[in-house]
Amino acid sequence: HKHLSPTHPDLLTVIVPRHPHRGAEIAEMLRSDGADVAVRSNSEPVTPQTMVYLADTMGELGLFFRLAPIVFMGKSLVPAGGQNPIEPARLGAAVISGPHAWNFSEITDAMVAHGGLEIVADGNALAAAIAADLADPGRTQARAHAALSYAEHESKVLETFIDRISPHLDAAERKRDAGA
């Protein structure tokens, strides 16, 4: 946010911690760094001065993925394994990840190949990627569309698999029931 706000003064960064109970700790860390923070669990409103909206509540991640045109997947700039990029892809966001998303390497590799995910090396590269997205909405929309297309394709693969094995499962169940 610090790198981008001079050229994008209306920018609002939304942080959704994986562990909402860390909300107060994260808010304090951000405030000590000079950020104006609104905390969702405290019902603090977003004002024109708000720099960061800390969505430290449960069950609303999809809402923020749908609202955000650009989503950065946490735990991926540090060696922590990353997070699954499929959910923001399904909800129409342009997805960015760091290089340490090994927990989801097959998905991230495939999404990169489809143009639906951008990998950045570090915080400076993340700021540059977001700046490029903000400067070129067509770039952002193209990556979001590619991410959604990939996610929909993967959903169809699962549906096809289920359609193909269901008759066999049904036959096995009938056979088991007949022998019982």
Regions found by a protein language model. Name each.
Residues H1-A180:
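Nucleotide-activated sugar donor-binding and catalytic core shared by glycosyltransferases
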